[in-house]
Amino acid sequence: ATESFAIIPDRLYYVGDNEVAIYLTQADDGTLILLDAGWPASGYQYWRNIEAMGFDPRDIDYILLTHGHGDQYGTGAELDTMIKNAGGDRVVYECYEDTYGYDIYGFPEITGIIEDTPVLNAVDKFYINDTWMEFDGSVRIKPVLTAGHTNGTDSFIFELTDPATNETLTISYLGGYGVNGNTKYDPDNDPTGRGYLRLAFQYGLRYLQQTVEPDYMIPQHTNQYPMLEINKAAEEKGIPFLEAVNRGSYEWVNFLEKRQAVITYEDYYQNWKADPKDEFGTEITVTDAELQTIEAAGPYRREGGTYQITLTDGGRIIQGFNRYMNQTDKLSG
């Protein structure tokens, strides 16, 4: 269990538990938007957290489910029923790809992954990816399909006005934890060709790194980013949450690169330690081949010295990788 708290007072709140991050957004006209529904056994905690922020969970207008895993949609059907029984008129969104599959892309053999009938019955609409969902001018949210964790995981870009300053802030959110068991290629157990999801996951990370420049970022799981620790330190320091986190796209780019590192690189390393052979039984060692850089010969070869490089076709240098998240002096002491 964990306490809820305001990320942007009167606009964006953390109402999840100590593992699954759930966010409640309030528009100026009172519209309430819940991002994900959490574990099926923890609904009481999420609803108490919502009440602690001054809202009635039965007043929620939109439930946005990020993908078809139980820790995201778990309480969705129960919350949907609770709102209906209270006379509420809510809309539940889910990604089409996790609900029904890839038939719309010409691949009917790739089906949806949600098998929970009450959840399937609760879904009202599907996301129109890369299209803004407008909420009264103070809130708008854009779903971005970033498959990989599942067939249809959606990430989200929020544009929210801060009621205290009237400044419009961009908040970015990566859907999905990372590469999981369903995305590992297993030639003996791969009935739906799930191997493509590993590449899709990495593509999604790169796409978000290069196309989204947020003011702040928020995670889907609290072990991806020290959300709760930062908030507790901010409370002890007596400063607002946003003052305790670094502003700008650096944190976002670094966060996405860490998802690449801890999920993919570590996975490869652990597999190699367990069995340093490829699928054909050939032992893999660093002495099997000579390492050579692309600068050694051909069009990329250059003499030593200082060069001015011009990036074309929209290319840009982002940054390197720092394994530490939210390095700041604001919480020292």
Which residues make up each language-model segment?
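Structural recognition of the beta-strand scaffold that forms the well-ordered cores
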Residues: 14, 24, 32-36, 61-65, ...
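Conserved beta-strand hairpin/beta-sheet module of binuclear metal-dependent hydrolase folds
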Residues: 2-53, 155-181, 317-319
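Binuclear metal-ion centers of metallo-dependent hydrolases, dominated by the metallo-beta-lactamase
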Residues: 225-294, 312
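Active-site HxH/HxHxD metal-binding segment of metal-dependent hydrolases
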Residues: 12, 41-44, 51-132
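Contiguous, well-ordered beta-strand patches that form the walls/edges
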Residues: 329-333
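Metallo-beta-lactamase
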Residues: 38-41, 122-124, 130-231, 243, ...
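Metal-dependent phosphodiesterase/nuclease catalytic metal-binding core
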Residues: 156-180, 234, 238, 255, ...
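Zn-dependent metallo-beta-lactamase
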Residues: 1-31, 41, 275-278, 282-326
